[in-house]
């Protein structure tokens, strides 16, 4: 009976996704982007686009693609090599926030390279971001010192993070550390509990990435999610599959629903643990195939928007099914 119920739920979701996808495709594609922009309703899980895949384009083009895809704004890269260089944050970031607003888009999340308050750019970035309405930012990555020891490394990083939290409190902004596959801090997920447990979740937390959690945690990832649930304040959404590269196992990011992430268990757990916060949609698979990069800009935009919409429709289907919007 439970299996039948599960199958029916999945079938209903597929039909829902198919319906909204067809409806989206029926919207005339026009350069008059304003006709397609709608202001997203305020909810517990506002969706933002991690800007990295589009950073190489003109910002106006980025805004058009994002607005046409039904995404409410950006999780903007404000880090070395990002859309905004930290050294020019005071002049560049306000302009982009203003321009995004013309498309009905918010910039209330950012991805930084911040790892210490000793860098003079740290306070400049946080002060500017906070003044512009950015409420959440992702911290830079931390490394384990295997010679010093794993536990000792965590204690060192904890002391440093306390100083960052003090700055977050000063500017009323929340800093999140993303769990990421590999041997850096956050890979195992449980280590983030030790890193965060003595800090206020109002100013420091985890940007929980279920894709990376499943890569490293296989069937046990759910344990780490339960452990750090009080500190999960933003969600990074993407999918993956395993493949063999030169005889070795490797992961590849794929469109949502085409990989191995257990979305039903993930969103059910999000609801059970009463987790809420902004969602950053990571589209880290090729948006343009070989040769498509040579197409006219408008044709590129059509291809990009179609792929973004597909991910957005998939995500919205789960948010609706589990009634956690």
Located regions from the model:
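Active-site acidic/histidine proton-transfer and metal-coordination neighborhood
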Residues: 20-29, 61-63, 99, 103, ...
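Hydrophobic faces of well-ordered beta-strands that scaffold small-molecule active sites
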Residues: 45-51, 74-76, 107-112, 137-139, ...
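Active-site mouth loops of central-metabolism enzymes
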Residues: 46-57, 111-119, 150-153
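Active-site beta-loop-alpha junctions enriched in small/polar residues
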Residues: 50-54, 77-81, 112-115, 142-144, ...
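Catalytic domains of carbohydrate-active enzymes, especially glycoside hydrolases
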Residues: 62-79, 132-133
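Glycine-rich, proline-tolerant flexible connector loops at the mouths of alpha/beta enzymes
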Residues: 77-95
